[in-house]
């Protein structure tokens, strides 16, 4: 059975609590989702803070935008894989998922990368609170 893990700090993380992900069309089990609890949320927040203080925080806005465009390109490259997963997970028909959901997922990465890259940075400058 497929396990859907949390991705925290560059690693896939299993948890002690899972639930079945069932296809809405026929109720078959698609896999087990590892539910994030307080420990996983805290670990994800700590990993985000480390990334902000590390390479990601030192990376230029242009480079970050390039990486987000690369994510969009990878979604498009693996279009059929994402399409099959979306249809199984949501029960949406091929016509809807292939013309709206997957293209929009890829487009969102590009749009927000371009907005940040092309917007005046002074409107986004702020201190990130550290616990």
Residue ranges of each PLM-predicted region?
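N-terminal Rossmann-like NAD(P)+-binding subdomain of aldehyde/semialdehyde dehydrogenases
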Residues: 1-131
């Amino acid at each position: 059975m497929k396990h859907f893990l949390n991705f925290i700090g560059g690693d896939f993380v299993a948890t002690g609590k899972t639930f079945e992900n069932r296809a809405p069309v026929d109720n078959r089990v698609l896999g087990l989702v590892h539910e994030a609890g307080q420990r996983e949320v805290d670990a994800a927040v700590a990993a985000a803070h480390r990334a902000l203080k590390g390479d990601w925080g030192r990376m230029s806005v242009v480079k970050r935008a390039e990486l987000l465009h690369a994510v969009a390109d990878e979604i498009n490259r693996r279009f059929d894989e994402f399409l099959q997963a979306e249809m199984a997970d949501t029960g949406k028909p091929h016509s809807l998922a292939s013309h709206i959901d997957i293209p929009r997922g890829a487009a969102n990465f590009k749009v927000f990368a371009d907005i940040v890259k092309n917007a005046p940075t002074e409107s986004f400058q702020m201190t990130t609170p550290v616990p």
